[in-house]
């Protein structure tokens, strides 16, 4: 049998028969298809997003909210509990801070005298102040003008400068250091019993009737001394100027002593023009003049003996409480004393007479407050 040889198969690829025109059409078709798909996606996108959002809110968020609501309720409950407790806490009144004590304020406490001649430097001043504070003192009296008329600081007044004491203290340092140590410094000034001042300026002095000689409270051979004239405006001005000086140096409280006339009522005394005003009336006017001049800037104290407070005397013309004195320091003589009941009775009677603050010095009873 005759064999015929196998014929070779011919593979035909479709692309082998693509023409240029066919390729162009195919490209255009693909481009059209892509555009159509994109357009369809653009149209469908809002609907797809709406569906996805709805699904999240209805399924996922509801689950999260249910968990967070429990936390919120717990927090809200805690906040309400805290809010409920706040009124209870705020209902307790807070303690108000105590107002600062001013230098002119009068406070309760013990008093003591200080020898100014020992206050020679800052160390001595501080040592004296600390000793007083350790003893429980509140007030410290420093005599800056004594009954001889000597002034223990550098006064700028003509009369004060002429009668400077051998020992001079630095007022500003004394006042500031005593305050730093918790004390109230009180400047003591003798008023009308001032022989040195009377001799330094005769216009301030009591004279003999019809003469230029200074009136003396005793014979010159017996140690008689002149006095300042309570009727003289120059005298009242001089004492007021001394008050102003010590206040400027830091002393907010001043004790005036010997605001009085000499005990003698001799017809030989020449007080100048009195306008018919008696002794009590003139002292009342002098005290009022100083009060008007300084007002609340300076706390003025007046020192008198127990006898001058409880009865009328030639020196005052009336009991001290009737002179318009508001702050009074009463000195009990060393020969007697007052018990607690007597002090209470004295305080009551003076308060009824118009005295606002009273300090009693009773050395025999070691009482000074």
PLM feature segments, named:
Residues 102-113, 117, 192-244:
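Active-site-adjacent "subsite" loops/lids of carbohydrate-active enzymes
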Residues 28-46:
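Hydrophobic membrane-insertion alpha-helices, especially the h-region
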Residues 93, 146-190, 264-298:
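Aromatic-lined substrate-binding rim segments of carbohydrate-active enzymes
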Residues 123-151, 245-257, 320-330:
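Catalytic domains of carbohydrate-active enzymes, especially glycoside hydrolases
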Residues 50-107:
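N-terminal, intrinsically disordered, polar/charged segments of Gram-positive cell-envelope systems
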Residues 186-193, 254-258, 277-315, 355-364:
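Aromatic-lined carbohydrate-recognition surfaces of secreted/lumenal glycan-active proteins
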Residues 45-53, 320-369:
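Substrate-binding cleft of secreted/luminal carbohydrate-active enzymes
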Residues 1-27:
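N-terminal Lys/Arg-rich, disordered targeting/topogenic segments
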């Amino acid at each position: 049998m005759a064999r015929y040889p196998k014929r070779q198969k011919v593979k035909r690829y479709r692309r082998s028969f693509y023409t240029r025109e066919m390729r162009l059409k195919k490209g255009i078709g693909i481009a059209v298809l892509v555009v159509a798909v994109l357009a369809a996606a653009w149209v469908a996108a809002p609907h797809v997003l709406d569906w996805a959002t709805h699904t999240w809110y209805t399924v996922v968020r509801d689950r999260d909210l249910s968990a967070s609501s429990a936390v919120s309720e717990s927090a809200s409950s805690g906040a309400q509990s805290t809010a409920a407790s706040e009124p209870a806490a705020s209902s307790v009144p807070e303690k108000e801070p105590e107002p600062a004590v001013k230098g002119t304020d009068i406070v309760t406490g013990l008093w003591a005298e200080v020898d100014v001649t020992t206050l020679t430097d800052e160390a001595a001043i501080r040592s004296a102040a600390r000793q007083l504070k350790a003893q429980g003192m509140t007030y410290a009296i420093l005599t800056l003008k004594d009954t001889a008329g000597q002034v223990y600081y550098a006064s700028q007044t003509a009369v004060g400068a002429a009668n400077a004491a051998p020992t001079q203290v630095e007022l500003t340092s004394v006042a500031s250091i005593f305050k730093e140590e918790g004390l109230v410094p009180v400047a003591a000034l003798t008023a009308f019993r001032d022989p040195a001042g009377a001799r330094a300026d005769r216009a301030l002095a009591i004279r003999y009737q019809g003469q230029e000689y200074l009136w003396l409270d005793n014979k010159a051979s017996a140690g008689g001394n002149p006095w300042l004239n309570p009727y003289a405006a120059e005298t009242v001005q001089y004492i007021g100027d001394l008050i102003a000086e010590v206040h400027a140096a830091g002393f907010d409280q001043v004790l005036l002593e010997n605001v009085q006339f000499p005990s003698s009522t001799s017809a030989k005394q020449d007080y100048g023009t009195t306008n018919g005003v008696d002794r009590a009336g003139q002292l009342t006017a002098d005290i009022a003049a100083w009060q008007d001049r300084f007002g609340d800037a300076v706390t003025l104290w007046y020192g008198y003996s127990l006898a001058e407070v409880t009865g009328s005397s030639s020196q005052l013309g009336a009991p001290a409480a009737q002179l318009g004195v508001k702050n009074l320091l009463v000195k009990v003589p060393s020969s007697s004393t007052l018990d607690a009941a007597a002090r209470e009775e004295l305080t009551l009677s003076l308060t009824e007479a118009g005295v606002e603050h009273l300090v009693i010095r009773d050395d025999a009873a070691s009482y000074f407050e």
